[in-house]
């Protein structure tokens, strides 16, 4: 038996060896094909599911999470990157600085808005009588006086103010002898002042007809009478209306036409009412 075994052809062992090698190669090829098939299957799965979360040993580095990985070409619009909560880009630097700067800017803008839009006073100053033109009706013993007055209106605001109307009346001996009203006067710009003239026609007659003799008396050069000038100015801004009133006693010459120089104090002599 041993002899017969010793004379067995060697090529059979070689064939067996070749067969073993071939089978091993086939197995390797099968594994490679299986892996390729599995990769194709995974690629197909990825294409079917645009949002995929990779976990475990098969996971790859996220290209947008501080990594350097790559994704297959053509799948840029199919894959969704998962950014971890601990990613530093989710915690921007200088957040406190930006918040403080935003708060400071808001406070600054609010302060400026309050400063410029806060309503300030509108000053009305009665300057005096600018002119007085006199005419007479001898039959009715009536005196007609057209009195032109001057006002200075000052706007202390940082925005324009509209002067809606001026209402004026003149009293003599506690009797109203003339009224006037002017509408839609003018606009006064920010921190500006305008001088406005207005005329009040007055009539002295009836129970005060005795004044006709005084005003036409030739022996007197100056026929001054004391009149109380009342004026109310209505202004408007931002839909809000405000009224400013003034009362002044003023000398007016009823014996002739007179033009007053407002700079001269003698024509601005004012009698204050008794307290």
Curated annotation (Swiss-Prot):
<feature type="transmembrane region" description="Helical">
    <location>
        <begin position="98"/>
        <end position="118"/>
    </location>
</feature>
<dbReference type="GO" id="GO:0007042">
    <property type="term" value="P:lysosomal lumen acidification"/>
</dbReference>
<feature type="topological domain" description="Cytoplasmic">
    <location>
        <begin position="2"/>
        <end position="97"/>
    </location>
</feature>
<feature type="glycosylation site" description="N-linked (GlcNAc...) asparagine">
    <location>
        <position position="184"/>
    </location>
</feature>
<keyword id="KW-0519">Myristate</keyword>
<keyword id="KW-0472">Membrane</keyword>
<feature type="region of interest" description="Disordered">
    <location>
        <begin position="1"/>
        <end position="24"/>
    </location>
</feature>
<dbReference type="GO" id="GO:0007041">
    <property type="term" value="P:lysosomal transport"/>
</dbReference>
<dbReference type="GO" id="GO:0031902">
    <property type="term" value="C:late endosome membrane"/>
</dbReference>
<feature type="glycosylation site" description="N-linked (GlcNAc...) asparagine">
    <location>
        <position position="257"/>
    </location>
</feature>
<dbReference type="GO" id="GO:0048813">
    <property type="term" value="P:dendrite morphogenesis"/>
</dbReference>
<dbReference type="GO" id="GO:0005764">
    <property type="term" value="C:lysosome"/>
</dbReference>
<feature type="modified residue" description="Phosphoserine">
    <location>
        <position position="34"/>
    </location>
</feature>
<keyword id="KW-0812">Transmembrane</keyword>
<feature type="glycosylation site" description="N-linked (GlcNAc...) asparagine">
    <location>
        <position position="152"/>
    </location>
</feature>
<dbReference type="GO" id="GO:0005765">
    <property type="term" value="C:lysosomal membrane"/>
</dbReference>
<feature type="topological domain" description="Lumenal">
    <location>
        <begin position="119"/>
        <end position="275"/>
    </location>
</feature>
<dbReference type="GO" id="GO:1900006">
    <property type="term" value="P:positive regulation of dendrite development"/>
</dbReference>
<keyword id="KW-1015">Disulfide bond</keyword>
<feature type="glycosylation site" description="N-linked (GlcNAc...) asparagine">
    <location>
        <position position="146"/>
    </location>
</feature>
<feature type="glycosylation site" description="N-linked (GlcNAc...) asparagine">
    <location>
        <position position="165"/>
    </location>
</feature>
<dbReference type="InterPro" id="IPR048511">
    <property type="entry name" value="TMEM106_N"/>
</dbReference>
<feature type="disulfide bond">
    <location>
        <begin position="215"/>
        <end position="254"/>
    </location>
</feature>
<dbReference type="GO" id="GO:0032418">
    <property type="term" value="P:lysosome localization"/>
</dbReference>
<dbReference type="Pfam" id="PF07092">
    <property type="entry name" value="TMEM106"/>
</dbReference>
<keyword id="KW-0967">Endosome</keyword>
<dbReference type="InterPro" id="IPR048509">
    <property type="entry name" value="TMEM106_C"/>
</dbReference>
<dbReference type="GO" id="GO:0007040">
    <property type="term" value="P:lysosome organization"/>
</dbReference>
<keyword id="KW-1133">Transmembrane helix</keyword>
<keyword id="KW-0735">Signal-anchor</keyword>
<feature type="lipid moiety-binding region" description="N-myristoyl glycine">
    <location>
        <position position="2"/>
    </location>
</feature>
<comment type="similarity">
    <text>Belongs to the TMEM106 family.</text>
</comment>
<keyword id="KW-0458">Lysosome</keyword>
<protein>
    <recommendedName>
        <fullName>Transmembrane protein 106B</fullName>
    </recommendedName>
</protein>
<dbReference type="InterPro" id="IPR009790">
    <property type="entry name" value="TMEM106"/>
</dbReference>
<dbReference type="GO" id="GO:0070050">
    <property type="term" value="P:neuron cellular homeostasis"/>
</dbReference>
<keyword id="KW-0449">Lipoprotein</keyword>
<dbReference type="GO" id="GO:1905146">
    <property type="term" value="P:lysosomal protein catabolic process"/>
</dbReference>
<dbReference type="GO" id="GO:0051117">
    <property type="term" value="F:ATPase binding"/>
</dbReference>
<keyword id="KW-0325">Glycoprotein</keyword>
<dbReference type="Pfam" id="PF21002">
    <property type="entry name" value="TMEM106_N"/>
</dbReference>
<dbReference type="GO" id="GO:1905671">
    <property type="term" value="P:regulation of lysosome organization"/>
</dbReference>
